[in-house]
Amino acid sequence: MNRTRFFAALAVLLAAPALGAQQQYGRDSDTWRWDGRVDAGRWMNVFNVNGTVDFAPSTDNMVHLVAEKHSNGRPMDDIHYEVVQAGGNVTICAIWNNGSRCEDGGTASLHRNGNNDNHSSVKITVQVPRGLRVGAHSVNGGVSVRDVGAEVRANTVNGGVSVRNASGPVRATSVNGTVNVNTAAGPVTAETVNGNVDARMASLQGNDDMSFKTVNGSVSIYVPARFDANFRFDTVHGGINSDFPMTLSGRWGPRHASGTIGNGGRDLRASSVNGSIELRSQ
């Protein structure tokens, strides 16, 4: 590539962020609202940095989001919101600095460039129709999804994750916090580092694998009585208990359990270092 073409291409790349900049909302307001319609089966994703994200059902088949800033004594006008609508999905991000931007869906939607020196928080509550897929994401703050979610993705770093009465598959993760999931239809994947994992499924769809992990905490898994899987459980300092037949090895130190339930099929993995593992029938 000659120098002229190289610098022309570089200019396009440097201009791309400006061309794709999103409109900013709520800089001058302590409370910001967004109301809109998202069709059943589409994703409603919300990303926060400091603060909670809570989903609950709406009563009018619309989406209603309320974001409330809470100051630590410093100005909050650098905190704003961006909305991305693409392919029928909606992503809303709380933005703390001008080097960040919101993108369409997925866990990479919020790119944080530079340091977040404003330690104020934003509380985000969202009411959605029950048939939506929902994503609740934060960094420093708990996330919860209650009575909604044809599919749920919920994650944070510092805080608990709670998913109650979802109607479809769930992926829930934390680092410092407990993870509790209850859904009418799995599969479920749930992980943390410091905290317990509790996952309950009234039924299962498809044949996707499931994984449950923690380091400092226990893992409890509740599945239907008619359940098929190939499983492996591993713990270092803890016991293994099951309502289903299993082969247990290692009386002292690391303990392992593996086997087949029913006709096998999906892989079920659970592990802890400092905690017990239990598989229960419900």
Where are these regions (language model features)?
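Intrinsically disordered, low-complexity terminal regions
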Residues: 1-282
